[in-house]
Amino acid sequence: MKIKMLMAFVALLLFSAFTADHTITIFMIGDSTMANKSLEGGNQERGWGHVLGGYFSENIRVENHARNGRSSKSFIDEGLWEVVINKVKPGDYVFIQFGHNDEKVDEKRHTDPGSTFDANLRRFVKETRAKGGIPVLFNAIVR
């Protein structure tokens, strides 16, 4: 029930910003809980972003840039954020969901709540807004 309500809210949000001359793109950035997964070998694991595009018409495109094992820090450090932000156009959405891997102890992924984690989220929001995009923050979901 919660997922249906979330999808209805997202659809309403997107349709309220729709203009006929612009295909809206939803850019997704996050970790494995959002990421697309290989379907080979009967793999049944899916991130929620894997199926999101199926809820929209051809006027709304979903680009899922979420990757397994990424934290907000590693997403930036690996250049994945730069790829996304360079594509954002006015009216596009950036769905942001990190947290699980930010708590890892290794220095390539670790961020501190109230400090580096918050700064990374603020960066995503600020840079998205600067391009005319609409940032949407999601809490980390249960794995």
Regions found by a protein language model. Give the residues of each.
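Bacterial Sec-dependent signal peptides at the C-terminal "C-region" and cleavage site
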Residues: 3-23
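Active-site-proximal beta-strand/loop segments in catalytic clefts of secreted hydrolases
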Residues: 29-33, 64-70, 96-101, 138-142
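Acidic/histidine-rich helix-loop elements
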Residues: 35-46, 66-75, 104-112
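Alpha-helical cap/lid subdomain in secreted, periplasmic
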Residues: 21, 79-143
